């Protein structure tokens, strides 16, 4: 299930709420309720606290309504931490991933609090594992030290049509 958490990206290069909503919608249409849940929860480590504002778009309203009815469980936390450790070029330490996301989307008011929750979740799973999460991720030292430019969508031309 966790591998499908970003299935909303199937609609293209879109912002966080759009890919969350589209993943939820697609998974629901397929009858994949557990995948739909992960599509909704993986980008919101603060869960209910994430929505201390009134959303503008219909997609954001739907996400808020879902999250407010949702009780976070360990699987939600696990997918959130896995998502926070992965880039398109491999596993990285959390700080590297946080900078990567911030460079692409900008800083949002709730990011720092979300980072704190992510570190708490990391420590929670490390307690269960009896070791650092970083100890079990292949090549994390090498990929953390890579410095690729932030990912940008390809430029459309006569040969490429999304």
Model-derived segments and their meaning:
Residues 22-25, 92-124:
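Divalent-cation-assisted or electrostatically stabilized phosphate/pyrophosphate-binding catalytic cores
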């Amino acid at each position: 299930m966790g591998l499908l958490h970003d299935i909303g990206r199937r609609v293209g290069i879109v912002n966080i709420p759009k890919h969350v909503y589209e993943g939820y919608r697609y998974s629901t249409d397929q009858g994949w309720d557990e995948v739909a849940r992960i599509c909704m929860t993986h980008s919101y480590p603060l869960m209910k606290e994430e929505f201390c504002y009134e959303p503008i778009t219909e997609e954001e309203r739907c996400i808020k309504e879902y999250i407010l009815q949702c009780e976070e469980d360990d699987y939600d936390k696990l997918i959130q931490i896995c998502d926070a450790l992965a880039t398109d070029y491999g596993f990285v330490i959390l700080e590297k991933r946080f900078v990567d996301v911030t460079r692409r989307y900008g800083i949002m008011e709730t990011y720092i609090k979300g980072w704190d929750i992510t570190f708490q979740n990391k420590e929670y799973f490390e307690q269960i594992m009896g070791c650092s999460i970083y100890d079990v991720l292949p090549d994390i030292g090498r990929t953390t030290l890579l410095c690729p430019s932030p990912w940008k969508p390809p430029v459309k031309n006569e040969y490429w049509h999304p």
